Amino acid sequence: MKNILLACGAGDSSGFIAQKMRKAAQAQGLDVSIRAVSDTEIMENIDGIGVLLLGPHLKHKFEDIQKEVAPLGVKADIIDRRCYATLDGETVLKQALKMMD
């Protein structure tokens, strides 16, 4: 199973995207776990995660967060602003899966 964690300010917006990603994954028959948390909850939810995707509004925190998660083997990136705004879960899922290859 591939484990993906999304993070935004409060976990709400990323929660909507996670829901769309789960639907896309289910439609494709993929074995993935997708969760969403607030940026303050990342480290307490990072165990077993392969990819961490941040909302675009957390770009200013990206370097610091990446430094924390990289030693744990977690790949991190920022969700494209357009995908985030339109809740394009399918494209965000593709982004995460590509990072895991």
Regions found by a protein language model. Give the residues of each.
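Short, well-ordered alpha-helices that flank and scaffold nucleotide-derived cofactor binding pockets
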Residues: Q19, K23-Q26, K67, K94, ...
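Generic structural signal for helix capping and beta-alpha/helix-loop junctions
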Residues: I42-E44, T86
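P-loop/Walker A phosphate-binding loop and immediately adjacent motor/lid segment at beta-alpha junctions
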Residues: K2-I4, G9-G11, F62-R82
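Conserved active-site segments centered on acidic
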Residues: K2-D39
